[in-house]
């Protein structure tokens, strides 16, 4: 695998060790920093792309994310910790992206939301799949937004995960 998607529901020492090994072998570490917790800068420097939601972005940056301006400041602050790519997920509003020194707001698809359970996980998985196929960060975020939009129109977590063929940009 060229990409490793990680989250924080296992001991942080394990996550940090896995990220260190992955970087040693030139793999891209994608981190979903959930559940929200404080993380060391030495660990974050091993992360290629971080995918925080509003709450996690606030914890990492100290900036409450309420709009595009505050998302920009939060992404910038998180990036200053050594992370090149920051994707702050904003639910129905889409995602705010910092890719190296470029910043972009990528809107979500408008859908009628039924159940948001698992939408963040769908976003992270779809993003990682698209990026692993060699697509750009922006295209990967658009694909992830589209997949998450499908997921929120269905009930449940696993049962709401769309097949790749269902996701249309």
Label each residue range with its predicted role.
Residues 1-49, 55-104:
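Ribokinase/PfkB-type carbohydrate-kinase core domain
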Residues 37-43, 68-169:
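Conserved phosphate-binding/catalytic region of the ribokinase-like
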């Amino acid at each position: 695998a060229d990409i490793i998607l990680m989250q924080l529901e296992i001991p942080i020492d394990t996550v940090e060790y896995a990220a260190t090994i992955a970087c040693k072998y030139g793999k891209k570490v994608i981190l979903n920093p959930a559940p929200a917790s404080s993380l060391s800068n030495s660990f974050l420097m091993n992360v290629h792309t971080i995918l925080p939601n509003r709450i996690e972005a606030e914890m990492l940056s100290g900036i409450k994310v309420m709009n595009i301006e505050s998302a920009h400041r939060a992404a910038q602050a998180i990036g200053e910790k050594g992370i090149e790519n920051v994707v702050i997920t904003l639910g129905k509003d889409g995602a705010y992206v910092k890719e190296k020194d470029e910043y972009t707001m990528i809107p979500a698809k408008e859908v009628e939301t039924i159940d948001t359970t698992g939408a963040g996980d769908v976003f992270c998985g779809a993003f990682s799949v698209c990026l692993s196929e060699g697509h750009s960060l922006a295209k990967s975020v658009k694909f992830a937004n589209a997949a998450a939009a499908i997921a929120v129109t269905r009930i449940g977590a696993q049962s709401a995960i769309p097949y790749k063929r269902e996701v249309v940009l």
